Regions:
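Residues marking the start of alpha-helices
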Residues: 2, 39, 101-104
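N-terminal secretory signal peptides and thylakoid transit peptides that target proteins
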Residues: 1-22
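Alpha-helical structural elements of signaling/regulatory helical domains
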Residues: 60, 64, 82-85
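C-terminal segment of N-terminal export signals and the immediately downstream linker at the start
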Residues: 5-6, 22-61
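Short acidic alpha-helical/loop segments enriched in Asp/Glu that coordinate divalent cations
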Residues: 64-72
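Hydrophobic/aromatic-lined pockets within catalytic cores
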Residues: 16, 20-23, 59, 63, ...
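Mature-region segments of soluble proteins
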Residues: 49, 53, 71-173
Length: 173
């Protein structure tokens, strides 16, 4: 797979994650592949990192870095700070994932992780993480560019007035 050089925006976004993480201190997860950090306040580092991997496992996109999936966990962590039931649901869910095969779930192969997730599929934990991922990953303006979405058009008069048919990837009819 061909790697693309990071843009100025990628660089600034990545370094801002690190700067904020260093400024806040506390428990911080540093990713080995990119310069970003996650500083959970309600969840422990292991739970937060597992949820990042779970979000990626549920909605994998090769071109998206883990820092985009970390925004999902940041949102859930913020909610869990004021909701003890949610915090317990997430920590218990991660404990079940880890206990399914006797080792940390994140250390399993993709196939084994999927098999363990399949056992959680009907439960509230799975549903909560899936919904949080959809609501926080796909509404992130920084993610739009990876999918060729130009963002909301409401502020600019709607799609009809701004050339809704100007996209280049549809065949000419």
């Amino acid at each position: 797979m061909k790697e693309h050089a990071p843009s100025r925006r990628d660089f600034l976004c990545s370094t801002s994650f690190v700067a904020v993480g260093l400024a806040t201190g506390g428990s911080m997860i540093l990713a080995p592949d990119n310069a970003w950090a996650l500083s959970p306040t309600a969840l422990d580092s292991h739970t937060a990192q597992t949820l990042v991997v779970m979000a990626r496992q549920l909605f994998p996109h090769d071109r998206l870095g883990d820092q985009y999936y970390a925004t999902v966990v940041e949102a859930v962590d913020k909610q869990a700070a004021s909701d003890a039931a949610l915090r317990k649901l997430l920590t218990d869910g991660v404990a079940r994932l880890d206990g399914a095969r006797g080792i940390a779930w994140v250390q399993l192969s993709n196939g084994a992780r999927n098999a363990v997730l399949k056992t959680e599929e009907a439960g509230e934990f799975f549903s909560t993480v899936r919904t949080a991922t959809i609501n926080n990953l796909y509404t992130n303006p920084l993610v739009y560019r990876f999918f060729g979405f130009e963002g909301s058009s409401v502020e600019h008069g709607g799609y009809i007035d701004s050339g809704f048919d100007d996209i280049g990837w549809l065949p000419n009819a």
